[in-house]
A protein has these predicted regions:
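Sec-dependent signal peptide recognition
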Residues: 1-2
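Bacterial Sec-dependent N-terminal signal peptides
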Residues: 6-30
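Short, intrinsically disordered, charge-biased short linear motifs at domain edges
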Residues: 21-22, 56-58, 111-112
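Short, solvent-exposed coil/turn segments at beta-strand boundaries
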Residues: 30-32, 50-59, 154-163
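Contiguous, well-ordered beta-strand patches that form the walls/edges
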Residues: 38-46, 63-160, 165-180
């Protein structure tokens, strides 16, 4: 079983009066901002995640690297999610944990070098990957999920760290995780 905690470092929420976006208050305010998790090992690869949360919208970018130095980009997965909403408070310790839901609007992959582009041939049922070109994976039975799928997750914020039950793009569609994990595996 893949256990995941995304311990991401971010900035604190602020009033986005420059863009006219409303200020989010309450528990969702703690999620606002940009969260980064730098150069971690995932399934034999190394990656960097960036989550940008603004209002009820989430954008994700996960760049995979060829080496542990995280300098040679291999490919990138990007997603956009909306309708972020707060569910139940499931606090069992001293830090508040909340259930959240969000809906996928776009999701895809971009190979970033020739070797990766060639290695993707046939992956996800797609034979014509193009280097530096985004490929939509929504409604792809092999590598994606249906558009407007709602994901179920949990989160807590401790200091400047965001903890999730599962990564944004890998959360369950059928049941909430029982807790925001303390390890990222």
């Amino acid at each position: 079983v893949l256990m995941s905690l995304v311990a991401l470092y971010g900035c604190s929420p602020d009033d986005d009066t420059a863009t006219g976006s409303p200020l989010i208050t309450g528990p969702l305010a703690a999620l606002q901002g940009t969260w980064k998790y730098h150069c971690y090992a995932e399934s034999g690869k190394h990656a960097e995640i960036i989550y940008k949360i603004s209002g009820t919208h989430i954008s994700t970018s996960k760049v995979y690297y060829q080496h542990s130095s995280c300098t040679d980009e291999s490919y990138k997965e990007e997603g956009a999610y909306s309708d972020l909403s707060l569910g139940d408070n499931i606090t069992s310790g001293k830090f508040s944990e909340y259930q959240i839901t969000y809906t996928v609007g776009s999701y895809g992959r971009t190979p970033l070098d020739n070797a990766t582009t060639n290695s993707f041939a046939g992956e996800c049922g797609i034979s014509d990957w193009t280097e530096n070109s985004y490929t939509n994976l929504l409604d792809n039975d092999d590598c994606g999920f249906p558009k407007n799928t709602t994901f179920l997750n949990v989160y807590k914020v401790i200091g400047n760290n965001l903890y999730l039950g599962d990564p944004i793009d890998a959360a369950s569609r059928t049941a909430f995780p029982t807790e925001a994990k303390s390890n990222f595996i």
